A protein has these predicted regions:
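Conserved, structured C-terminal
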Residues: 1-178
Length: 178
């Protein structure tokens, strides 16, 4: 097997966590997260090839492209795209698929699609955000929360209550240079 032959080279089995770390750090999509069925969140439709950031690979000039008109119509209506982000500090809470992404004023502009620990030990992820937030270096706020840990509404908080605070992140290059 590959494991037997590769043992002397340090080959080891990896699971889904390894796959997710590698693809997320490389900026690659996973069906159901960054595109395809189940990728739409917060009342939005499922993400297509354009929203996933791969629209430039669609050959709309090919004469036999049956879905050309549907693809182009969807591209004209597209409001956002998947970007890669990074939390600049270690020790922050992991973001999960569906967690809200906010702008600096606290307005929801998208949602997390994936998040994993990168080779430098920082959390790196991908998120679908509105088009005006895709530039590298754009600051984001992410609510990395589990539904059971939302806490009381801010207006109902009392002394000693704990609330969730969004974690600062920044948009980084979608496909990092090697």
């Amino acid at each position: 097997t590959i494991l037997t032959v590769g043992e002397k080279f340090g080959v080891k089995p990896v699971g889904l966590g390894g796959r997710d770390s590698l693809r997320t750090e490389a900026g690659l999509p996973l069906y159901g997260h960054e595109m395809g069925a189940g990728s739409g969140k917060q009342g939005q439709r499922d993400l297509g090839v354009g929203e996933a950031g791969f629209g430039s690979y669609v050959k709309v000039y090919k004469p036999w492209f049956i879905g050309r008109e549907a693809f182009l119509a969807r591209e004209r209506e597209r409001k956002g795209v998947v970007v890669r982000f990074r939390f600049p500090e270690k020790g922050v809470r992991m973001a999960h698929n569906g967690d809200p992404v906010l702008d600096k004023r606290g307005r929801v502009i998208g949602w997390v699609t994936s998040c994993a620990i990168d080779s430098e030990g920082l959390l790196t992820g991908q998120a679908y955000v509105e088009r005006s937030y895709v530039e590298e270096g754009t600051p984001l706020l992410i609510y990395p929360s589990a539904p059971s840990e939302t806490g009381p509404a801010p207006a109902k908080m009392k002394l000693g209550d704990k609330g969730l605070v969004p974690t600062p992140a920044v948009v980084v290059s979608r496909f990092p240079k090697g």
